[in-house]
């Protein structure tokens, strides 16, 4: 997790160790939740955009990756509890929550369990809270966007994963192969960050804990009073209809912003789009 100029580090004591984070800015407080699960924090540019839009941002490395604790459990309940621990440590009673991908799903979980703590949610390229949230089509969509050689190498790595012989280098390479496919224009995609870190154990346990809570989450979202704006690219491999639109359809105070020609990282592919969506979220919350 790289600190931007002006960001101040903090640590929150939680079961198993600490959660490490960064905060900066003046204005309404916003908690940022990164994607994954089991990935290093990567929302520096998004935090900067939101601070320029008038928010004070707090972002943290979710457990499973240093400098936060690498101890489990890594299930949804624990990740939600860690987020609340960050709010409590910071003395933040009510916040805007901005989540990306898996982090958007965590934001939905927070809104369903602690609506009194959330002023509103901006869910960017999010895994949805209805059905499987679009998860089942993500892998096939990514593989369809890379070349034959990439698909063949990806299949070889998957075989090693299934056999239990995959290395950490295999995990990084697997993400590197599909990384360009997350973007609306794969040829123009930036390189995979050199400091990316992955925890397969965290990712697997977190994902496995989603399905058992699916029915409760969908029921809770249907009556959730928290306003939410979904910001989603029409070329996101995490399909818009199965994720953002399906979830918005069951929520009483939800809107969807569709970005043409944009993939999974709107703030990188179309700078300013998250700040624009924030304006709509504030209006929805009034």
Q: Where do the language-model regions lie?
A:
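Conserved HGGG/HGGXW glycine-rich cap/lid loop of the alpha/beta-hydrolase fold
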Residues: 10, 15-69
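Active-site loop/oxyanion-hole signature of alpha/beta-hydrolase fold enzymes
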Residues: 59-98, 102, 276
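Conserved hydrolase catalytic core segment
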Residues: 93-137
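Flexible "cap/lid" loop of the alpha/beta hydrolase fold
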Residues: 121-161
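Alpha/beta-hydrolase
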Residues: 154-219, 225-226
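Short beta-strand/loop motif that positions the catalytic acidic residue
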Residues: 224, 230-232
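Conserved alpha/beta-hydrolase "acid-adjacent" motif
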Residues: 237-243
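Catalytic active-site module of serine/aspartate enzymes centered on a nucleophile-bearing elbow/loop
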Residues: 254-286
């Amino acid at each position: 997790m790289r600190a931007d100029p002006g960001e101040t580090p903090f640590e929150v004591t939680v079961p198993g160790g600490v959660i490490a984070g960064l905060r900066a800015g003046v204005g309404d407080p916003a908690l940022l939740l990164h994607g994954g699960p089991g990935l290093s924090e990567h929302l520096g540019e998004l935090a900067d955009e939101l601070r320029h839009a008038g928010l004070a941002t707090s972002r943290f490395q979710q457990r499973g990756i240093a400098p936060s604790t690498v101890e489990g459990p890594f299930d949804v309940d624990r990740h939600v509890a860690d987020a609340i621990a960050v709010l409590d440590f910071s003395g933040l009673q009510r916040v805007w929550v901005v989540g990306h991908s898996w982090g958007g799903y965590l934001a939905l979980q927070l809104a369903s369990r602690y609506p009194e703590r959330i002023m509103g949610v901006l869910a960017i390229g999010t895994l949805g809270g209805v059905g499987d949230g679009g998860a089942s089509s993500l892998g096939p969509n990514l593989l369809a966007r890379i070349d034959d050689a990439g698909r063949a190498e990806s299949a070889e790595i998957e075989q090693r994963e299934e056999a239990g012989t995959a290395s950490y280098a295999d995990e990084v390479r697997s993400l590197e192969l599909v990384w360009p496919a997350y973007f609306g224009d794969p040829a123009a995609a930036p390189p995979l960050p050199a400091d990316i870190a992955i925890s397969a154990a965290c990712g697997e346990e977190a994902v496995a804990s989603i399905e058992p809570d699916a029915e409760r989450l969908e029921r809770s979202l249907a009556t959730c009073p928290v306003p939410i704006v979904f910001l989603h690219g029409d070329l996101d491999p995490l399909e818009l209809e199965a994720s953002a639109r399906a979830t918005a359809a069951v929520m009483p105070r939800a809107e969807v912003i569709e970005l043409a020609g944009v993939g999974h990282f709107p703030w990188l592919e179309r700078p300013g789009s998250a700040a624009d969506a924030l304006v709509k979220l504030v209006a929805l919350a009034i």
